[in-house]
Amino acid sequence: MKISSPSAGLVVAVIGSLSFGTSGAFIKPLLEAGWSPSAAVTARVLVGGLVLLPLALVSLRGSWPALWRARWRVLAMALAGVSATQFFYFAAIQTIPVATAALIELLAPLLLVGVVWVMTRRIPHALVLVGSLFAVGGLVLVVGPGAIRAVDPLGLAFAACAMVGCAIYFVIAARPSDGLPPVGFAAAGLVLGGLVLGGLGVTGVLPLSATFGPVPLAGTALPWWVPLVIVAVVSTALAYVAGITSAEVLGSRLASFVSLLEVVFAALFAWLLLGEQLTPLQLLGGALILGGIAAVRAAGSENAVPATLEPLIPVPLMDAGVVEPATALDR
């Protein structure tokens, strides 16, 4: 899928956010059944990558040199955009609340704005600053005001590292494809990232545990593999392809702000499938996030991530059983 229109890129970005946002509602039953967060995310990443593999092989026919040229980009996505982000998030939620860790990680768009500010020594466009304030306020309301509290400094440091990994994901995804199809890039990054996470689990760095009985979902008992397959296909395979495709068109800054809609979609799916309450504050938060995205888009491409940053090649968090930060599973 190759697009060039900014409007089409925005639509694809929203589809990606919606896809990422489904993960919490479908993974939560597995977590409640005894799956560890690291086992759930390792399975979704590996299965999602394997689902994309046949499509990637077809899309890469005649384009294998493009994959070789992008080898460092693929490696960076697998190690930083997938594995490191997940690893640091899991480390963070061992000592700080899940909502707090999710809120910190989702501040990645502001990190990108700050990096550009420092590197260009130019104050960002006023609309970008306004959009950033709206987005932060919306995140706090959707994730939950209780996410802001005094917590363990080490946990905060790990969450900050996860935020950096999330920002890196957007910078990598927004780089020119140089002939590499998004589906091929996503498949390679997910398979390699899943193998890294699996290796960390096998060596005991990440705890891996799973159960294989029926799980309740939407008022009925389903085999354990049903929600896992949905998450792997929709929340991982489709979501990563859509995210990478849209980031190439929109750029890292706007794509990262649009991704904040994940928390809104996560709350909506939790309400529809799990019966979780959708509060007026969450609806207001969603409106603020939309306002922030609109402001950033209105600012245009000014102050986008500079080319000097992109060669550094800097998703998407893991839901550990609460709905508000369900997008923690996403990157």
Language-model-derived ranges and their functions:
Residues 25-37, 94, 142-153, 203-223, ...:
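Membrane-interface helix termini and inter-helical loops of multi-pass transporters
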Residues 1-43, 148-175, 183, 199, ...:
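Glycine-/small-residue-enriched transmembrane alpha-helix faces in small-molecule transporters
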Residues 52, 115, 124-145, 163-166, ...:
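Hydrophobic transmembrane alpha-helices of multi-pass small-molecule transport proteins
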Residues 39-50, 86-123, 162, 252-271:
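Specific alpha-helical transmembrane segments that line the substrate/conduction pathway
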Residues 2-3, 11, 45, 224-226, ...:
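C-terminal-most transmembrane helix of multi-pass membrane proteins
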